[in-house]
Amino acid sequence: MVRDGAKAPPHHEGEKLIEDCKVERFTMNFDDTPQEAAFRAEARKWVDANAPKQYEAELSKASLGRIKLENEEIVDVGKAWQKKKAEGGWACLHWPKEYGGRGATPIERVIWQQEEGVYGKLTQPFQIGEGMCGPTVMAYGNEEHKRHYLPKLASGEQIWCQLFSEPAGGSDVAGLRTRAEKRGEDWIINGQKIWTSGAHYSDYGLLITRTDPNVPKHKGLTMFFLDMKSRGVEVRPIKQANGMQEFNEVYFTDVVIPDHQRLGAVGDGWNVSLTTLMNERMSIGARLATGFPEMFEFCANLMTDDGLAIDDRATRSKLASWAVKASGLKYTSYRAISALSKGERPGPENSIGKLVAGSMLQDIAMYAMDLEGAAGVFTGAAEEEARGQFQQMLLSSPSMRIAGGTDEILRNIIAERVLGLPGDIRVDKDVPFNKIPTKGR
């Protein structure tokens, strides 16, 4: 968001950032520092000069960042934008310069997201690589890994995916069954992953496997990265209810991964995965969608039998409630940003934010369709008023309550880390993985 009195270009979506944390963690200043104001001006100038403005109108109507450009493939357009950002020094801002980034502060990163606006949706194919896989490679890879792979990820030359969830191990990541067996200097991988976003267009993947079934489930895991074009890797896109194919099943049959593509020690995969999962929640939280801006605009323009929707008392009451939640989410995220700006680790802010935003998104989509009446049943019939964005939002919103941690997992985090309640009873604690009862055994 721009400072008071300044005019923002139409693609700016953000609110003014709470910039600088003063004295205490929860004392926050709304204004840009001189350095941040200069950074914002530089970013705005570059975006105005380089953004692919032919896509602005379509991007502004894309619900949840689910982009489906009419005439061009999103991956190709995204790669072109990512490459241009890398050439201009605006890709993966928070990464070190030697790995393709800019060494920017957390607040500068948020300022950039505000100034990039709707064009940030074009980089959707790179969000997992930048926000989750890249930081994991940075933390556990050797220097050769970092200098070879990270600049290519930052420039858009490579796309990465995250291979964690399995048919019998979604929220319980440590319950995974994909096996990795050591043979000489290589590892042989067999198993299956599911709900892998972007696997069908990814070049590399971050893969967590089970290397020792004779120890408790969290202790027998090992992390690797692999070429998604490796022999024995089969990717099957999953057709979704909204007509898109963002997720995939991935099968591994005697896939060979050299030991030098291991991240972390053998058996330490759980600790490595915590780095990935922590960055996943932060990545999701950075661009948390609520549907409120779209809903407010929709109600302000939708004419019903009784007049404008926004003039209806019941609708105004709902909008007021959502506005309060949206404001709370904004300031909760600012708290996390303030902590990061001081070098602190954020608390449970992203869990709280995702939990509230996910349910809010679903509620808004359902109410919008109620307002549309009969037109809400068919995407095409509503195109004139809302371009079908709320129908797409309703079909996609359940996934937002699952990806990056289900509502139940997030409530457990809040209960245990914020309220200090005792953790769930775990009957499999300290039990070797191969001794845990399963169906058919």
What role is predicted for each listed range?
Residues 156-164:
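A short, Trp-centered hydrophobic/proline-enriched beta-strand micro-motif
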Residues 30-34, 39, 233-331, 339, ...:
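Glycine-rich beta->alpha junctions and the first turn(s) of the following alpha-helix
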Residues 21-127, 148-155, 284-285, 300-301, ...:
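Amphipathic, small/basic residue-rich leader segments at the start of a protein or domain
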Residues 78-157, 197-204, 326, 340-348, ...:
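Internal helix-loop-helix
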Residues 3-20:
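A cross-taxon signal for low-complexity, glycine/charged-rich
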Residues 177, 185-186, 190-236:
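A short core secondary-structure module
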Residues 56-63, 304, 313, 327-383:
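C-terminal helix-coil-helix/basic helical segment that borders enzyme active sites and/or dimer interfaces
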Residues 49, 53, 86, 90, ...:
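Alpha-helix capping/hinge segments and adjacent helical runs
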